[in-house]
């Protein structure tokens, strides 16, 4: 490294490695003027002025036209170049409405740099085009036209002016939409610590050490804590907002992305509080607290510490100042969680500081009036949300050479903006058959470009920003409209809630109806199955200790397997179930299978005790099963009742042809059924229908299509018809015949008690 030395003393007077980053007013003057001696008086020179008498004449001679300097200069030729007008004749006349001017209307900028522009009111259609295409836009437009032309020979190329118009409308509508949408603030500790310095965590300030707020991120710092020599007039920005306002940066020593940042000598970012808290590093520029150095001197053991708050192995941690505590945490995490820490500076420039910090167990209980209890859950929630942004390869190693960034997420354009752009273009009579598809493709390109720019806007026009300020956000009409929309949404929500509840009730009733149908089918077609299941459950309940749960070698299959076979319809008779239970009563077989005498004794006693009781259960089951009215197929006979509650005979065709209730009858069967119905007495008929209608049904027979059905026929359906008025035309009996052969007029009490009950049930079912 080059240095300068005095020839007399040999002392270094200029060291670039130390003075390159120092302000000029702080560098010693001898570094610039090493021979200047301020203690010695200056020498005064006296002499005759005659030796300077010809100086003025020589200067005049130098400036004369005969000077050899002017003769040596080349003669410059000035050529007047006529300005070339902008070629605007090829612009579509419809596109000129968006602010494009012809060559005759071009206004050349005057010599002055001040121009007063009137702020136009907010308008969605009257606006000039403020977007200019760049190289990327031109390349995409060329590729898009070539791609469309390859698939469609009649394709009309999209002009550059059209693309500028569409991108301007999209950008305006997107900015207006963002202005209307409410901002969602993240979980921030600064709301709890409003007005405190983010470095020393103190709110007290003095005239020479005031708290300064950043005009962009609102970060509050002391002058001495952040190296601010004086409070500037006007706006002040922190180092992060001044050097990288649109970038997402991370600290090299912690995962926190908020706070006061400074730079390192190797070009990275870190928090000022992190540089103060870590004892191995220091500031190269102590006056501005910037340029952190000696990062390589941090031991590896500090890089391997895991923070007890964010649970991330990222950067370097500090440890609790208690001599018996080894809790490690980032100092920024400690501030978010409300831990106690205090900075002790031995000078005003923070060139030598000491920090005292304590974990949650050793923090004084009266610190910040119990603020730690509120901030600690917020800090854990903040780092849980951010944990997905930290790659795994950085969790198990020391701080990387570069700051990792997660994938930037940009929001896609809503369909509202796409429709809005199309409507604006149609309002200007921009007529193209493929206009919606072109606008959609341009919106996709706009979304990808915003994503590549990390969601930065494409336009930064002051006129557009002024129009955003004039948005009628607080207009009374809009608030009334918002209330109306909210009321309509609330009504729709209530209707939807009612519909969902009704749907849930309907599905519940359907489920109950399905279960009832299943039970009815089981009772009708498997009458013995319910009897077997109930009998088996009673027998299993007798084995309280579960002695016969497991299968045995004598043929016993166990309660679990036996229950599965019964409930899966593999055992269909009482005799089959008795055979399955015979190994339990076989005492000799049980003795041969069990070696444990205590268990064997209990099983034999259970078999001897319950054998008689089980046989009684089987006898009762057989008696009940024999009392059931079954047909020749083993199905339960369901009585057929008329609308008047009286039982009547079924159609004999089913029994004669040995048909099932689910079989489809032929045309001959239907004819026989028709004759049977016509032969019934008027009091026995359920309904009447024209013969022509029945003949048409027989002629066009594909499935059983008979008029409305009700009642039962051999466990299935009987027929019922209605007249034109919608009233059933069934006939009621005029009189009732008693057992002794006498007749009496029909009344409600004319029937026996059981028949009245049957009839009342039938009427209830019919209604």
UniProtKB/Swiss-Prot annotation:
Localization per Swiss-Prot or TrEMBL: Cytoplasm; Nucleus
GO cellular component term, pick one: cytoplasm
Gene that encodes it: nto1
Comp. bias (Polar residues): 724-752
Subunit and partners: Component of the mst2 complex composed of at least eaf6, mst2, nto1, pdp3, ptf1, ptf2 and tfg3.
Organism domain of life: Eukaryota
Protein name as it appears in the record: Mst2 complex subunit nto1
SUPFAM superfamilies: FYVE/PHD zinc finger
Residue ranges, annotated region (Disordered): 724-767
Zinc finger feature spans (C2HC pre-PHD-type): 248-281
The organism's taxonomic lineage, starting at the top: Eukaryota, Fungi, Dikarya, Ascomycota, Taphrinomycotina
């Amino acid at each position: 490294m080059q240095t300068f030395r005095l020839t007399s003393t040999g002392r270094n007077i200029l060291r670039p490695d130390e003075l390159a980053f120092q302000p000029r007013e702080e560098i010693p003057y001898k570094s610039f003027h090493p021979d200047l001696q301020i203690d010695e008086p200056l020498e005064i020179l006296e002499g005759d002025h005659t030796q300077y008498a010809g100086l003025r004449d020589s200067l005049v001679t130098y400036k004369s036209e005969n000077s050899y300097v002017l003769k040596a200069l080349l003669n410059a030729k000035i050529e007047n170049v006529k300005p070339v007008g902008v070629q605007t004749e090829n612009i579509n006349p419809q596109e000129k409405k968006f602010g494009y001017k012809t060559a005759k209307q071009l206004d050349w900028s005057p010599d002055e740099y001040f121009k007063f522009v009137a702020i136009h009111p907010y308008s969605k259609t009257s606006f000039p085009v403020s977007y200019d295409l760049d190289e990327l836009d031109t390349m995409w437009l060329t590729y898009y036209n070539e791609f469309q032309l390859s698939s469609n020979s009649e394709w009309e190329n999209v002009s550059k002016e059209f693309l500028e118009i569409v991108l301007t409308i999209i950008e305006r509508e997107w900015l207006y939409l963002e202005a209307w949408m409410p901002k969602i603030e993240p979980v921030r500790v600064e709301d709890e610590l409003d007005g405190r310095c983010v470095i020393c965590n103190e709110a007290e300030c003095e005239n020479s050490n005031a708290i300064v707020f950043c005009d962009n991120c609102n970060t509050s710092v002391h002058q001495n804590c952040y190296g601010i020599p004086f409070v500037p007039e006007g706006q002040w920005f922190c180092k992060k907002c001044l050097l990288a306002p649109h970038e997402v940066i991370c600290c090299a020593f912690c995962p926190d992305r908020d706070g006061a940042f400074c730079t390192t000598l190797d070009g990275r970012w870190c928090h000022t509080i992190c540089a103060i808290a870590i004892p191995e590093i220091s500031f190269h520029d102590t006056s501005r607290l910037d340029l952190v150095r000696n990062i390589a001197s941090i031991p590896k053991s500090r890089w391997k510490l895991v923070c007890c708050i964010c649970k991330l192995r990222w950067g370097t941690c500090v440890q609790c100042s208690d001599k018996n505590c080894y809790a490690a945490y980032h100092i920024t995490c400690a501030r978010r969680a409300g831990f106690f820490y205090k900075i002790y500076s031995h000078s005003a420039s923070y060139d030598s500081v000491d920090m005292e910090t304590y974990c949650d167990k050793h923090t004084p209980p009266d610190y910040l009036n119990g603020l730690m209890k509120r901030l600690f859950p917020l800090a854990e929630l903040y780092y849980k949300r951010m944990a997905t942004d930290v790659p795994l390869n950085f969790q198990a190693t020391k701080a990387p050479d570069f700051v990792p960034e997660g994938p930037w997420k940009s929001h896609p354009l809503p369909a509202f903006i796409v429709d809005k752009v199309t409507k604006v273009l149609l309002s200007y009579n921009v007529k193209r058959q493929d206009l919606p598809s072109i606008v959609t493709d341009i919106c996709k390109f706009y979304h990808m470009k915003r994503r590549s720019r990390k969601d930065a806007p494409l336009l930064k026009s002051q006129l557009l920003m002024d129009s955003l300020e004039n948005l009628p956000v607080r207009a009374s009409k809009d608030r009334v409209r918002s209330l109306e929309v909210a009321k309509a949404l609330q009504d729709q929500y209530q209707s939807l809630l009612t519909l969902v509840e009704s749907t849930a009730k309907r599905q519940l009733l359907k489920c109950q109806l399905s279960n009832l149908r299943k039970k009815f089918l089981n009772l009708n077609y498997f009458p013995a199955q319910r009897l077997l299941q109930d009998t088996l459950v009673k027998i299993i309940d007798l084995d309280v200790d579960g002695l016969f749960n497991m299968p045995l070698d004598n043929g016993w299959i166990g309660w679990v397997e036996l229950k599965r076979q019964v409930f899966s319809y593999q055992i269909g008779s009482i005799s089959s179930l008795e055979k399955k239970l015979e190994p339990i009563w076989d005492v000799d077989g049980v003795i041969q299978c069990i070696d444990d005498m205590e268990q064997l004794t209990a099983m034999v006693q259970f078999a001897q005790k319950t054998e008689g009781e089980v046989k009684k259960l089987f006898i009762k089951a057989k008696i009940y099963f024999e009392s059931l009215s079954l047909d020749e197929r083993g199905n339960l006979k369901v009585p057929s009742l008329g609308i008047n509650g009286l039982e009547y005979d079924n159609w004999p065709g089913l029994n004669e042809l040995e048909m099932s209730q689910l079989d489809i009858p032929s045309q001959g069967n239907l004819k026989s059924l028709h004759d049977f119905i016509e032969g019934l007495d008027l009091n026995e008929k359920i309904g009447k229908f024209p013969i022509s209608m029945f003949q048409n049904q027989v002629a066009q027979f594909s499935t059983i299509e008979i008029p409305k059905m009700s009642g039962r026929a051999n466990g299935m359906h009987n027929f019922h018809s209605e007249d034109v008025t919608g009233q059933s035309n069934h006939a009621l009996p005029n009189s009732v015949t008693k057992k002794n052969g006498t007749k009496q007029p029909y009344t409600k009490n004319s029937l026996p008690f059981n028949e009245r009950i049957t009839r009342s049930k039938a009427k209830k079912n019919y209604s």
